[in-house]
Structures are given as structure tokens and as C-alpha cells.
């Protein structure tokens, strides 16, 4: 079992589409912002640490179910947790929660650790697996 972490984000005017709510593509921006924040703040492994070691994370796939719209000036909570770690991939589940606590969107992403020079997948070092196993 892995811990769940949360990051709060305030919806900006630039996030709003012509329907008056957050555009669907912005949900991915929120997820990215939250993951980078949580890697540094919660896991104590900032993304820059991966870059220094010659690694990077690439998104293999993301699945999102949109349930409720988000609106300007709403403070949302992005909750994420590691669901599964395999040899070269990490499955991260997420929820975007409205002010009310109701789920606005949910889903998961699969990330692949890659060698920054070759662009090829590499095995996740045991030290990283240990950091994520909190």
C-alpha cells in the first residue's frame, strides 16, 4: 500500500474554455503540477534529481474520466498515489476534487523511466522504488 498525497491548485482565468469551465486538456497540467510538487515535497526526490542522474519520466498512457466541471477561482485538490511499480513503469492513480470534496475527474497514468541520453526505457533503481514505497 502506498500513501496518498494532495496538492491544492486555484483555477486560473486562462484555464477556462468557451463553455465557461476548465478545458479538458488543463486537467493534465494540474496533474503534472501536482506530481512535480509531490515528488519534491512528499517523496523528497525532486524531478531535477532524476535529470542529474541522467533519467527522465515519460508518460506511456493516461486515462481520465471527467465527472464534474471545474470553474474559475475554484480551489481544487489533486490527490495522487502510486498504485503499482513494475521493473520500468509506475502506475499513478489520481483524483481531482472540487471545493465540495466531490470528484471532478479521476484516472491513472503510467510513467516509464527513461535514459535521457538514449531515450530508451530503463529499470527503476531500487533506491527510487524505496522512496516511492511510503
Where are these regions (language model features)?
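Hot-dog-fold acyl-thioester-processing enzymes
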Residues: 1-60, 114-134
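HotDog/MaoC-like acyl-thioester-processing domains
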Residues: 3-7, 71-72, 83-134
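Conserved beta-strand segments that form the floor/walls of ligand-binding pockets within enzyme
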Residues: 10, 23, 65, 77, ...
Amino acid at each position: 500500500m502506498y500513501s496518498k498525497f494532495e496538492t491544492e491548485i486555484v483555477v486560473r482565468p486562462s484555464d477556462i474554455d468557451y463553455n465557461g469551465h476548465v478545458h479538458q486538456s488543463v486537467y493534465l497540467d494540474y496533474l503534472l503540477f501536482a506530481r512535480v510538487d509531490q515528488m519534491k515535497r512528499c517523496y523528497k526526490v525532486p524531478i531535477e534529481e532524476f535529470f542529474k542522474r541522467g533519467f527522465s519520466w515519460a508518460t506511456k498512457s493516461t486515462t481520465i474520466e471527467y465527472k464534474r466541471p471545474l470553474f474559475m477561482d475554484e480551489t481544487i485538490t489533486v490527490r495522487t498515489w502510486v498504485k503499482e511499480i513494475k521493473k520500468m513503469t509506475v502506475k499513478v492513480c489520481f483524483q481531482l476534487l472540487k471545493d465540495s470534496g466531490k470528484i471532478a475527474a479521476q484516472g491513472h497514468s503510467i510513467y516509464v523511466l527513461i535514459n535521457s541520453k538514449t531515450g530508451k526505457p530503463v529499470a527503476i533503481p531500487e533506491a527510487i522504488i524505496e522512496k516511492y514505497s511510503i
